[in-house]
Amino acid sequence: MAERKGTAKVDFLKKIEKEIQQKWDTERVFEVNASSLEKQTSKGKYFVTFPYPYMNGRLHLGHTFSLSKCEFAVGYQRLKGKCCLFPFGLHCTGMPIKACADKLKREIELYGCPPDFPDEEDEEEETNVKTEDTRIKDKAKGKKSKAAAKAGSSKYQWGIMKSLGLSDEEIVKFSEAEHWLDYFPPLAIQDLKRLGLKVDWRRSFITTDVNPYYDSFVRWQFLTLRERNKIKFGKRYTIYSPKDGQPCMDHDRQTGEGVGPQEYTLLKLKVLEPYPSKLSGLKGKNIFLVAATLRPETLFGQTNCWVRPDMKYIGFETVNGDIFICTQKAARNMSYQGFTKDNGVVPVVKELMGEEILGASLSAPLTSYKVIYVLPMLTIKEDKGTGVVTSVPSDSPDDIAALRDLKKKQALRAKYGIRDDMVLPFEPVPVIEIPGFGNLSAVTICDELKIQSQNDREKLAEAKEKIYLKGFYEGIMLVDGFKGQKVQDVKKTIQKKMIDAGDALIYMEPEKQVMSRSSDECVVALCDQWYLDYGEENWKKQTSQCLKNLETFCEETRRNFEATLGWLQEHACSRTYGLGTHLPWDEQWLIESLSDSTIYMAFYTVAHLLQGGNLHGQAESPLGIRPQQMTKEVWDYVFFKEAPFPKTQIAKEKLDQLKQEFEFWYPVDLRVSGKDLVPNHLSYYLYNHVAMWPEQSDKWPTAVRANGHLLLNSEKMSKSTGNFLTLTQAIDKFSADGMRLALADAGDTVEDANFVEAMADAGILRLYTWVEWVKEMVANWDSLRSGPANTFNDRVFASELNAGIIKTDQNYEKMMFKEALKTGFFEFQAAKDKYRELAVEGMHRELVFRFIEVQTLLLAPFCPHLCEHIWTLLGKPDSIMNASWPVAGPVDEVLIHSSQYLMEVTHDLRLRLKNYMMPAKGKKTDKQPLQKPSHCTIYVAKNYPPWQHTTLSVLRKHFEANNRKLPDNKVIASELGSMPELKKYMKKVMPFVAMIKENLEKMGPRILDLQLEFDEKAVLMENIVYLTNSLELEHIEVKFASEAEDKIREDCCPGKPLNVFRIEPGVSISLVNPQPSNGHFSTKIEIRQGDNCDSIIRRLMKMNRGIKDLSKVKLMRFDDPLLGPRRVPVLGKEHTEKTPISEHAVFNVDLMSKKIHLTENGIRVDIGDTIIYLVH
């Protein structure tokens, strides 16, 4: 991106922002209390929340994009007269902060302070192997993945902290987890305040037991959930050290911090008899090769199964007597997950090498092939999955590459004893349609990248990167039973169907290798712990009812919710390590981060009355309530309408004040988040609200808006590549309003949005230009036109303002902010620029200032600082934060259409004039350039020519019969071609149909009308001065096409005028300026028949750009046209022996004799070959 030339404009915006933020702070504009609002709620309230961000670093542009949706919504709803609350908390619960602090502590213990680290050895490059490592991230592990994301490229925590710009002295403090809670939350608030958020900061808090009020609130929530039988105790998957005999949490790990369990679908591939000789001793037993897959939805396309010939495998007996074949490592994991009779014991019945089961025949679930075979793949690794891999060449680049190797290389088949019939008949089966890659995505991408074999590891990794994520988010199923459904919606359903049928099992292993401090490689084990029973039927049913009434703004979000409710089961809500609130009935457990963050929006409603504005809840409570007084019964009374008044020392009126706040603000009117939180946090949010208020559906969430991820300059944000911006960096670079404008423009849907730096820079220029224009208008108030605002362009501009208000209102209401920015700023500014250009009589004062006021209000949710500043420039006494949405007056659509017509005609005429001036093709171009025409006749048609009239009638008939759509061109061409009256015109007919179809898209059904809704001749005549000036012509006349020659009559149609340019002949005379030292010169000018002073002065102004004002020029003729021009002018006597030419005088030209005379008051006067012009 090109370097900026300077920062004056962005500095100007930042200076305004600082002043305005100070003003808001002083006036406490965003602080709201239910007690003072209840009397004035005729237009309702609006309570919006954003998932509190995790406090292990600075906020970045991705956070800002999501929260900007809340911010814009609040800005709009304030203008609509609602009482708005936007609170903002900060999340500290969970493992990452504690793990980072403990890691720092360990580094200091091992390497000193500051640490002297050993040279980092080159880490072994991880080979891309057939283990499906390009996987869809498990969003439920969002907090852990954040820890990984913060790690950057440094191996050591100390290095990571250094990369944040911290000194050695400061870093040491971060070895205590509490310091993180003191350091990052104030920075987050500082950055968000710079953004200009409309937040009531009194209600902010941090989570964990550091804040005794929040701690008490979460304990109350969990006691209530347990009381209602929503929390159970039982076995859950966790990282476990067999050597230590206990779960291995982050602080117990030598390597693998932040790593959690990875869920696979374990596919059972039944070995068919006759068994391979190595397995013959197991005759009578059910033997299965078990393959671990992350992509159960692809299994409809299995063609074979892979094993590595030189890898060791075992067969072990499962709890029900079946034999599973896999690696020893996978069997060890399975033995801790209930697969074997005794926990942790693998009863091995057979040891074998992969090559000993090659060629075995299998029965595989879901695939259309009745029998598939075990084939060799040389790149399988032992440290991931089971060592057995099922092959889906339609959707896996590794599989199609390996299958092609075997098909192409007879010698390879012979080496491993593979018969042709085990390989050659098996072709990829279409399972999933992926936009851009078709229904055999792996085949397509391998051909595109020219992948030659399974050893092209780098290209195969690139291929998987390209199709796996796209396949998950955009892939559409093609198989029966799931046809037309999105992959992400059916993935879990397919997995469940297979498990229920006994064809698959859930299998877990660590995402990456985890080594305990005792140097034991960890497994995933089923361990006892507390969990929320989300799958429970009645709870799920009630949550589905909540979802039915939830506004999701787009169908994809609703489908994602529905799919999640379909598969969501128990969720472990307790941990033994990290920060957070302890389970009230079992203090050894901490409540984990996705479980203490489901109904905290209720805490926002009362936080300011408890905490005294202190994030940690350590200040004196405004109501004098101590944390320990907030018992379960007290919380019940505050949040449950029917709960009795508790035994407490707190005065009733104080608890009633808390209750009033909750009752006033609840439910949450809008929650905004990234779409990746739908399958976890947002679904838990619905579940928990239903559980806590089962009989009060009026307390359930009202709306959830999910957005896509944010790209930066069309690329993924990444610290390692440097394509990354923190919130504070973005504000420094673009100002708050400049950044907000670009965020609004980044995107509205659940697809990925794009923050473009060039757009942000262009936005800064637009905002600066806008405020400068407002200043200019305020300064020139007196010189603007007054009186009735009733010219054609006045009326058009007024209608366009009103239409803009209505469209922008609709876009804001639907949370389509990119569209609201388009209709409420870009199109609004374009309407003003058009008015300024068209209003040849000058802009009307009343309209200009109505425009400024309306524009400021429409833009205020996006750019509040600048709009507050402009509001002040307009002399408004109150803050724009207390203003109301503008009232739209009547909209004359016909008038707007007629103005659009005028702009199109002007554009067409300019193009035609340009083409007229260009030498004809094929002719020599060394001739003089063509002389510019002086006159133009525009022909307008009252009706369509007969052939067009007939064509339009046919199109309208089809449009109305075909559900307001036009059929294919073949259908239209067939009917029109059979009509005798059109035979002569068929060359013109289909291009005319194409033009109508194109305009139908742009302008709607009115394009099919046989007559225009306005008088186009009248529109052109009202704007004749503008058209003449715009084309720099002398004169334009408008006539009906019926007055023109045949060709024009045949082709001219309503709304598409034709024209003829011409050069009106004239006689050249000298135009002399006798005034000394004024920069005006003498020139030759053409005088044409019928000219007057006005037309001659306008012609002069085109040649002499120094003349700005027509009224300042005066024309004079010599009393003696023959001798007068020969006399030397005398200084100060420029008027002597000359007569002023009246504005009513008409010039007459005799082309034959090349002479000019004036007709004035019926008297004819010769003027010779020279006249005088004076500029005053």
Curated annotation (Swiss-Prot):
Motif 'KMSKS' region: positions: 716-720
Activity regulation field: 5-fluoro-1,3-dihydro-1-hydroxy-1,2-benzoxaborole inhibits LARS1 by forming a covalent adduct with the 3' adenosine of tRNA(Leu) at the editing site, thus locking the enzyme in an inactive conformation.
Cellular localisation: Cytoplasm
Reactions mediated catalytically: tRNA(Leu) + L-leucine + ATP = L-leucyl-tRNA(Leu) + AMP + diphosphate; L-methionyl-tRNA(Leu) + H2O = tRNA(Leu) + L-methionine + H(+)
Alphabetized PROSITE patterns for the sequence: AA_TRNA_LIGASE_I
Binding site for ATP: K719
Region (Editing domain): 260-509
Acidic residues bias locations: 117-126
Keyword hit for Ligase: yes
ATP-binding found in the keyword field: yes
Residues annotated with Phosphoserine modification: S167, S720
CDD domains on file: Anticodon_Ia_Leu_AEc
Residue stretches of biased makeup (Basic and acidic residues): 127-139
Coiled coil (residue ranges): none
Modified residues (N6-acetyllysine): K970, K1047
Gene Ontology CC entries for this record: cytoplasm
PANTHER family noted in UniProt: LEUCINE--TRNA LIGASE, CYTOPLASMIC, LEUCYL-TRNA SYNTHETASE
Domain notes: The structure of cytoplasmic leucine-tRNA ligase includes four main functional domains: the Rossmann-fold aminoacylation domain, the editing domain known as connective peptide 1 (CP1), the anticodon binding domain for tRNA recognition, and the vertebrate C-terminal (VC) domain for tRNA binding.
Annotated protein name in UniProt: Leucine--tRNA ligase, cytoplasmic
Organism: Pongo abelii (Sumatran orangutan)
Name of the gene encoding the protein in the UniProt record: LARS1
